[in-house]
Amino acid sequence: MKICIFFTLLGTVAAFPTEDNDDRIVGGYTCQEHSVPYQVSLNAGSHICGGSLITDQWVLSAAHCYHPQLQVRLGEHNIYEIEGAEQFIDAAKMILHPDYDKWTVDNDIMLIKLKSPATLNSKVSTIPLPQYCPTAGTECLVSGWGVLKFGFESPSVLQCLDAPVLSDSVCHKAYPRQITNNMFCLGFLEGGKDSCQYDSGGPVVCNGEVQGIVSWGDGCALEGKPGVYTKVCNYLNWIHQTIAEN
């Protein structure tokens, strides 16, 4: 799921994120098979979120994707068929950021430790963490099995979207008083292309590094409402410390 925002007029405009089943790549394209080998599917009886494999035993995802019983599925392309490259590994630990706020969606980041290490190969591999924070205009790749259109069923095969990082000023203008220093916007102000329902937790990869985590937005692919992503570069110390201690 991707968190969607609904607006209520109370003299001023207040926004409250609510979990809504509305998260798949809109306006993208079918990824070349196994071209995103770090992409994982989080399964709780069915696909609920995406994630990124950052070591052979750790996955990066969104805190709002937490579920008490998760299976991490690697090497997937068509999530409804067994194609031979899959590795299904149960989660041993799920560690949410201690300052995650489900109302503001700040610090929307989670680490998942696999019960056993993944076998790395051409179809299952890790993605590096960023060395620097993303800059406006950088082209990135977003991927996931989220819905292709708000309110519709999810696709069976992995979808991809190429989209630019937007400036902080554009992001704040799109979502007044909602963007924290731990978030950034990516996408197209004209709408039509975006992450959506069930893309949540999935990777935003820029220049070969995982810079973002699909987090929230106002609907999907709406004009003037780009997707909002967790800024991974702000959490490098927490990620390294958490892995070292667990």
From Swiss-Prot:
Name the catalysed reactions.
Preferential cleavage: Arg-|-Xaa, Lys-|-Xaa
Required cofactor names: Ca(2+)
Highest taxon above the source species: Eukaryota
Q: What class of enzyme is it?
A: hydrolase
Pfam families attached to this UniProt entry:
Trypsin
UniProt cross-references to PROSITE patterns, sorted A to Z: TRYPSIN_DOM, TRYPSIN_HIS
For this UniProt entry, what's an example GO CC term?
Answer: extracellular space
Q: Where is the active site?
A: H64, D108, S200
Those residues forming the propeptide, per the database entry, are 16-24
Q: GO biological process: what's one of them?
A: proteolysis
What is written in the cofactor note of this entry? Binds 1 Ca(2+) ion per subunit.
Where does the entry annotate site (Required for specificity)?
Answer: D194
User: Localized where?
Assistant: Secreted, Extracellular space
Q: Which residues form a coiled coil?
A: none
Q: Does the keyword Signal apply?
A: yes
Q: Which GO terms describe its molecular function?
A: metal ion binding; serine-type endopeptidase activity
SUPFAM superfamilies named in the record: Trypsin-like serine proteases
The record ties this protein, via Gene3D superfamilies, to: Trypsin-like serine proteases (2.40.10.10)
**What is the disulfide pattern of this chain?**
C31-C160, C49-C65, C133-C233, C140-C206, C171-C185, C196-C220
Record carries keyword Metal-binding: yes
Question: What residue stretch is flagged as signal peptide?
Answer: 1-15
Q: Which residues bind Ca(2+)?
A: E76, N78, E86
UniProt KW keywords: Calcium, Digestion, Disulfide bond, Hydrolase, Metal-binding, Protease, Secreted, Serine protease, Signal, Zymogen
Q: Which family does it belong to?
A: Belongs to the peptidase S1 family.
This protein is called Trypsin V-A
